[in-house]
Amino acid sequence: MCFSFIMPPAMADILDIWAVDSQIASDGSIPVDFLLPTGIYIQLEVPREATISYIKQMLWKQVHNYPMFNLLMDIDSYMFACVNQTAVYEELEDETRRLCDVRPFLPVLKLVTRSCDPGEKLDSKIGVLIGKGLHEFDSLKDPEVNEFRRKMRKFSEEKILSLVGLSWMDWLKQTYPPEHEPSIPENLEDKLYGGKLIVAVHFENCQDVFSFQVSPNMNPIKVNELAIQKRLTIHGKEDEVSPYDYVLQVSGRVEYVFGDHPLIQFQYIRNCVMNRALPHFILVECCKIKKMYEQEMIAIEAAINRNSSNLPLPLPPKKTRIISHVWENNNPFQIVLVKGNKLNTEETVKVHVRAGLFHGTELLCKTIVSSEVSGKNDHIWNEPLEFDINICDLPRMARLCFAVYAVLDKVKTKKSTKTINPSKYQTIRKAGKVHYPVAWVNTMVFDFKGQLRTGDIILHSWSSFPDELEEMLNPMGTVQTNPYTENATALHVKFPENKKQPYYYPPFDKIIEKAAEIASSDSANVSSRGGKKFLPVLKEILDRDPLSQLCENEMDLIWTLRQDCREIFPQSLPKLLLSIKWNKLEDVAQLQALLQIWPKLPPREALELLDFNYPDQYVREYAVGCLRQMSDEELSQYLLQLVQVLKYEPFLDCALSRFLLERALGNRRIGQFLFWHLRSEVHIPAVSVQFGVILEAYCRGSVGHMKVLSKQVEALNKLKTLNSLIKLNAVKLNRAKGKEAMHTCLKQSAYREALSDLQSPLNPCVILSELYVEKCKYMDSKMKPLWLVYNNKVFGEDSVGVIFKNGDDLRQDMLTLQMLRLMDLLWKEAGLDLRMLPYGCLATGDRSGLIEVVSTSETIADIQLNSSNVAAAAAFNKDALLNWLKEYNSGDDLDRAIEEFTLSCAGYCVASYVLGIGDRHSDNIMVKKTGQLFHIDFGHILGNFKSKFGIKRERVPFILTYDFIHVIQQGKTGNTEKFGRFRQCCEDAYLILRRHGNLFITLFALMLTAGLPELTSVKDIQYLKDSLALGKSEEEALKQFKQKFDEALRESWTTKVNWMAHTVRKDYRS
């Protein structure tokens, strides 16, 4: 049976050749063009699911009939090459792959001599894996890119060499690191069975399951011993075995429990206890682990040979040149604005350029505006722009920002604009004219080696402006130029030449010398301390949240009392850095010296120093030094932000990129998420090279992980193809036929193999073993997400569900769910477990990704609909939810379910209020059969509530309906004790989050470059400051929250009306 989708003619040539369509059956053939080394061209009909090896044999049978066959070598001397779907030249070394999995851009295969260079083979594999050919980096001929790649290749090789000496146990710790947490929540002991754990263990290839009670403080090797004793008791003595011959593996997962940590510290066991589930283990023989280890060592040794064979020869030593430091140059900084072209404005429109020097968001001197010129193609200025700052005072990370503006008469704006949308961007109104932004571009004043830029440069600009601009410039924008040069506005700028010798920013030792020189002078020692009388004032300033602005006097006070800040208030460092005059070399030198003796900050506080406001190289190195104190689990919590702030780094080689690579290469779990966070954005032009070379470095240092990641990439490509076909044909096919066609596709061998036995990108511990095709479906929403269900082959394990989305940006969902996980962590640290359920979500590409399915759960809408015959009345049935819980729980289980509901409802009430989560209807609030309530779909956050005709549809600060209260009160109207406890939980949870308000503001600020539609400027983060009442006392803040709680309760009828409308629409569509 062939796939019954009908493709449009335009797609039939490419897409459905490799996908599944109505014209080519799964066992059908397609015409493929073959190009031989002799120049001969052959076309053959080839089965689309044939392996590369089979196709080569087919071709070889035919080449005998063509001229110059005698010039060809043996068949094994050749392999095929093609251009794949990502425009990467790929050599098909692995001949077990199917043609439909290779998916050439066009059905053309070139026969090439098999490469003997193992380095080239690795390069080809890396290019395919990261979705960007390494030849693209070579073709840039960029000295910085080449230097970084060379250093990272050496760095990766050193990491690989360090693996060679590892024991198999050390390798296991690094490859499959166990997740554990030393601190134990207070309420965990209440959920043990008389202070004991019950665990289930079975041996591989054995159906017997042994359950026994153990102490939560027992270590894993003791569990091995007890399991062996149980087996001996039942089956008698067999071969002599030792508990050290086995390792505990979590059933159904690639997760191992080993080492000296007590059982209760392992995350898996802790989760089982919290969820009242039975921890289930398999005793795996160590020899099996050793075999995996040996296979990876073989791959590692091959990689060492590959890397070393492909390393470029070292360059001959350069002659030592006399260099000058910029601190010796007291001349004003100036450039020449030569010309601009491709401005995309009418010939009569006048254009000017604004230029400014920034350090972070601080303007170092007044902006400069060029004269106004007009022109058809080129706009000629040849105009010197002199800035009010001397070269010696330029900080190392100074950036030069340009913006091109069209100058239009107010009355002629509509007729004069060619492509400008005046209403979209901020404008300057002056002297009866309006200045509209056309393009912007930024560049660093010093290059990656610290040399002051010289000579002519062409800056290809960007045309999309952010909502909020500084001085009508975009200092937070990238310093990379637009790679799409063909249509981009280009500015020709000339930096001053220095004919004698280049100017460099002083090295670190010169900076410290300068600071010592200043410190020895009488004037410097007068005012570094202020005495006790200033400390209360200083403390009040330093206690403010990160969004609070400092006035000039406050900044002077902080700088004056910098020694007091270091000794008494080390957490004041961010505010001290905002108080320094970065356009004054003396202050900068003193700060760098002070930074060397500044106490290390806790990692959570140091995160703020990676914000855009702190671009200084040594500050960021200090921040990374603080982050090194983080455990792997804590680092994973903030990895999303740490990847985003790479965009703030102006140069490729920086402390942060090295730190992330180092930790990723030391922990494969971190490595997997770093890989996907980078790869999901590698298509973005501004970061394509930066993220691409970091991905290359990770792959070179973790060749053993490449096979796992390649399997995931292949599976996601298959899902994307399937989803595209479903969307193309959803209108033509009814749901039943569409689902049948989907199942037909999934049953094909190419899809079945690609989508089976892979580690889940959402969680590397989870194995997606075998699709349960009959339960797979696509959903009704616009983008037709794929709902996939996997059977778990291991005894006693539930099925695993994942949703694949293609066409929706999941990064905002990722951010919101990360915040929910952090809230859960902070509450647990304070002894409050609110049973949160932040499910997995991962962006894996351009508007595509995966979402974890929470098993045994239903939406509020479905629960209500199933309890009523009339859709309009369903939303007002307050008994529906409680009755549903009673259907699945009784007795003590029902009491526990209501407790779970009460706690989780409190958690999500507070979380949705603090984060400003909008669009809350009955289809994006769900409940598990065990009682846990949780929210899904976070398309609107930070108070961006949906509105219609200018009227907000959501009037309540958070969702608290009477059917929720009915469950909390156990169905008893007068049960004020239960409701009072619920309210107290909400208030406690709110105050706990408020105490960590600065952390939430910092994390959102670090995401400003992510390009999320509802997080584009600092103004968006202001919502958090307001919801957490950070400018008020704790009493005032609690009073504000109590008012919001009462408002949610009082206005809950409006929620029910919205839910009724939603339920009626849903019922009508179904």
UniProtKB/Swiss-Prot annotation:
Compartments, as annotated in UniProt: Cytoplasm; Nucleus
One GO molecular-function entry: 1-phosphatidylinositol-4-phosphate 3-kinase activity
Maturation and modification: Autophosphorylation at Ser-1070 negatively regulates the phosphatidylinositol-4,5-bisphosphate 3-kinase activity.
Domain named PI3K-RBD: residues: 194-285
GO cellular component: cytoplasm; cytosol; intracellular membrane-bounded organelle; midbody; nucleolus; nucleoplasm; nucleus; phosphatidylinositol 3-kinase complex
Family to which this protein belongs: Belongs to the PI3/PI4-kinase family.
Identification of the protein by name: Phosphatidylinositol 4,5-bisphosphate 3-kinase catalytic subunit beta isoform
Annotated organism of origin: Homo sapiens (Human)
Classification lineage: Eukaryota, Metazoa, Chordata, Craniata, Vertebrata
Gene that encodes it: PIK3CB
